[in-house]
Amino acid sequence: MIFVSFADTRNLKTIFKPFNNGNMSVVNLISSCETCTRRWKNFQHLTKEELNLVNDNRYEATFKPGEILMKQGSPTSNALFMASGLAKTYIEGQNGKNFILSIALPGRLILGPGAYVDSRHTYTVAAITSVQACFINFEIFRHLVRVNGAFAEGLLEDISAKSLGSLTRMVNLSQKKMHGRLADALLYFSDIVFKNDEYEMILSRQELGEMTNMAKECVVRILKELEDSGVIYSDSSKIKILDRDKLVQISVKG
């Protein structure tokens, strides 16, 4: 672990050497963090020199659907940012049972609480679509947290917002009935992921069950009931919300 005993950043490049990947050839598609349109919003608090430090210590990788970006239990040597595509974050439970936490979107920081607890990834991240991702040396993050108060506060806000969202989900999953839980998921994809009432359902029925804590058969049955009652239209992977007010009511009443 690297510790820095001063608060200014005049000699940052003498402390952290730019990322060296040995003999592996890597071509970055993003020219720099400064010009990236999908960069994490908290980077706005960095000085130009600090942002250059981040840029010098990152590398990009492209993943196909189904490939693992981060593995639960592996070392947290890097922070992950997605430049494009969608991925699922999930806990690998016992007996092959997974619990999907959220859908990872471009421009978001992917860094679990384990980074500051046991230096292990708390969950697995797998690509749903083709994904272009940036990996940034976690020691750079530790350094910036120590020397840049605004950046540190932004990181705390990010982690706190995710923790609050997870707590809310846990309460809803424990207190709502199956119809309410599935309504929550459909609204999540509409409001957060796609921002549209009509979208391609990127999760299988099995994965929807892993997200809502119910069996695949229950997901199929409730989707059919919602369609028969005119609340949604469902055709293979396509979902269209026809009666948003009714779906919200189902979500609220659980």
Residue ranges and their predicted role:
Residues 45, 103, 135, 202, ...:
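Short aromatic/basic micro-patch
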Residues 52-53, 69-73, 193:
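Short loop/turn motifs at secondary-structure junctions and domain boundaries
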Residues 146-213:
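Polybasic "coupling" helices that flank or enter modular domains
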Residues 12, 189-254:
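Phosphate-/nucleic-acid-contacting segments
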Residues 6, 15-65, 109-110, 114-117:
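Cyclic nucleotide-binding regulatory module and flanking cytosolic helices
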Residues 42, 67-129:
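Cyclic nucleotide-binding regulatory domains
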Residues 50, 100-164:
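Cyclic-nucleotide recognition modules
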